[in-house]
């Protein structure tokens, strides 16, 4: 067994740079995944793979093949610092959450940042403007943007249509001898009048086979859901499953796998999960059926959309195949038998829409100080909505059906507000489960009202943002020497509306200051400093979204050696 493991490890280590005839591993370490292609995320399907970077930042990132730099972007959210390279084989590679760019790319980006006097920028390049060689270092791995930990988010796209492609299908090797793990199977029974029932089914596991021991005797229209994950060797992360296939009596009734995606698929991700279980019970059950007609690029065309009817005296042999990209397979098997009486299954979860809001209609609910509007197509299907207004607070209870687009809200502003109060007044929100944390809701003010779009569940009220952002130095002090520092760090935080803009100056000259909002961190690298003065006057001006401003000043000193 030890010899087998050593052989596997050796294969993984020595093959990291032998990805395919044409492409290199973007990192100089074996590919271990913390996220797989097509994985279910909160608001989208994962359009790349997340490659682990030994839990740290700063690992060299290389171009997988020759190509042209076509785009580079710096953002405090999303992909953070990201590079796009168009290759000559019809694909584009994407390298996201970088700590920094290569010197060649960094020089171009900094010129734009200093010209625009802004940290966040985006640059599109002409074909052939910046040639990139295979294995050329294009940056170093990091944790910028919306990343929750150090890693490289890597994508491969079809250049012609921007369609994300599964990198594992295009030559990138990941050692994987572990079949998917199935945690639970759920049966859904569909009733009349937009009602359904859910039951968890106990499974018995024997290696890669999961079985339901007892025959299920029931009747009616059914669908199936599951919870599960996949793992790869040498990694503890629970990642998404590549392929799933449901068959009834040998006939395929529902299946899909993640070879590629289109970005619009992600907008409808909630249709492929039990939204009520996810939103209320915090269980992400993936459905193996579609109760609502909706197009997904990866979904196979099957006759019944995964739904099946159990009728008297009929037997239904159900098999669900789960497969990872390396063809490791797990199977679930169960038998259902039709009966004419009420089924003997006890369903612990019932959902009944007694008086639902219908997607093809618009609704407006008026209160004393606000109006709530439910636009047409706010939800994919009829749904119950519960809301209440008291003590100047609108409470919208948690949704049980997936929203298609948000609701809208308008508060009437008090009359006679002075200009400062009018600027600072805003809509606040308490999210369920986070009662002490007020969230700012962006709204436009006009004609004595403040309007907010795309709102969801939560508690809404009028509040004021009166505090400017706080600014505190981390690794330096006013009036002290900074010769031993290569970077100046400051803790910058705003209590409500968030930071809108900022500018830093040293001895009167604008200097690039980077911003990482998730860490409440701003910093200046001394390599950006052009002054040779021994005394450095640092001034930082930070403004939040509603216009509150804070200014910070520090006098710093260096010993200049002639």
What does each model-identified segment do?
Residues 103, 175, 188-342, 495-562:
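Long, low-complexity serine/threonine/glycine- and acidic-rich segments characteristic of extracellular
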Residues 18-92, 99-101, 119-128, 133-151, ...:
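Surface-exposed, glycine-biased beta-strand/turn segments
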């Amino acid at each position: 067994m030890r010899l087998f493991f050593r052989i596997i490890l050796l294969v993984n280590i020595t093959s990291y740079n032998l990805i395919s005839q044409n492409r290199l591993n973007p990192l100089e370490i074996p590919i271990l995944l913390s996220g797989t292609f097509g994985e279910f995320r909160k608001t989208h399907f994962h359009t790349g793979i997340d490659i682990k970077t030994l839990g740290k930042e700063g690992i060299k990132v290389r171009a997988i093949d020759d190509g042209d730099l076509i785009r580079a972007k710096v953002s405090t959210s999303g992909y953070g610092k990201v590079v796009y390279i168009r290759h000559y084989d019809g694909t584009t590679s994407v390298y996201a959450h970088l700590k920094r760019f290569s010197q060649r790319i960094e020089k171009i980006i900094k010129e734009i940042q200093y010209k625009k006097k802004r940290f966040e920028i985006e640059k599109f390049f002409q074909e052939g403007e910046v040639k990139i060689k295979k294995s050329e270092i294009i940056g170093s791995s990091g944790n910028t943007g919306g990343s929750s930990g150090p890693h490289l988010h890597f994508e491969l796209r079809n250049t012609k249509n921007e369609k994300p492609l599964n990198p594992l299908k295009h030559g990138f090797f990941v050692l994987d001898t572990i079949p998917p793990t199935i945690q639970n199977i759920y049966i859904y029974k569909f009733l009349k009048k937009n009602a359904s029932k859910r039951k968890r089914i106990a499974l018995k596991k024997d290696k890669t086979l999961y079985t339901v021991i007892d025959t299920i005797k029931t009747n009616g229209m059914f669908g199936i859901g599951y919870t599960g994950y996949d793992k790869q060797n040498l990694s503890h992360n629970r990642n998404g499953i590549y392929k799933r296939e449901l068959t009834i009596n040998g006939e395929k009734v529902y299946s899909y796998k993640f070879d590629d995606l289109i970005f619009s698929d992600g907008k409808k991700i909630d249709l492929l999960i039990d939204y009520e279980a996810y939103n209320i019970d915090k269980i992400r059950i993936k459905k193996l059926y579609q109760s609502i007609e909706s197009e997904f690029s990866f979904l196979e065309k099957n006759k019944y959309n995964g739904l099946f009817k159990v009728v008297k005296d009929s037997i239904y042999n159900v098999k669900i195949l789960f497969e990872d990209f390396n063809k490791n397979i797990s199977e679930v098997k169960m038998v259902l038998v039709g009966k004419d009486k009420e089924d003997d299954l006890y369903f612990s979860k019932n959902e009944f829409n007694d008086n639902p809001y219908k997607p093809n209609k618009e609704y407006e609910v008026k209160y004393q100080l606000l109006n709530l509007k439910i636009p047409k197509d706010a939800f994919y299907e009829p749904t119950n909505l519960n809301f209440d207004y008291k003590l100047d607070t609108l409470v919208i209870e948690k949704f049980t059906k997936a929203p298609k687009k948000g609701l809208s809200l308008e508060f009437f502003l008090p009359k006679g507000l002075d200009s400062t109060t009018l600027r600072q007044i805003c809509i606040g929100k308490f999210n369920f489960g986070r009662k002490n944390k007020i969230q700012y809701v962006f709204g436009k003010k006009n004609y004595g009202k403040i309007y907010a779009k795309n709102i969801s569940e939560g508690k809404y009220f009028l509040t004021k943002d009166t505090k400017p952002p706080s600014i505190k130095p981390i690794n330096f002090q006013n009036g002290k020497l900074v010769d031993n520092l290569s970077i100046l760090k400051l803790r910058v935080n705003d209590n409500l509306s968030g930071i809108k803009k900022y500018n830093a100056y040293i001895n009167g000259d604008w200097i690039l200051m980077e911003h990482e909002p998730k860490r409440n961190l701003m910093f200046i690298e001394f390599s950006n400093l052009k002054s040779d003065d021994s005394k450095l006057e640092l001034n930082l001006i930070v403004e939040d979204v509603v216009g509150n401003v804070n200014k910070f000043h520090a006098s710093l000193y260096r010993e200049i050696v002639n």
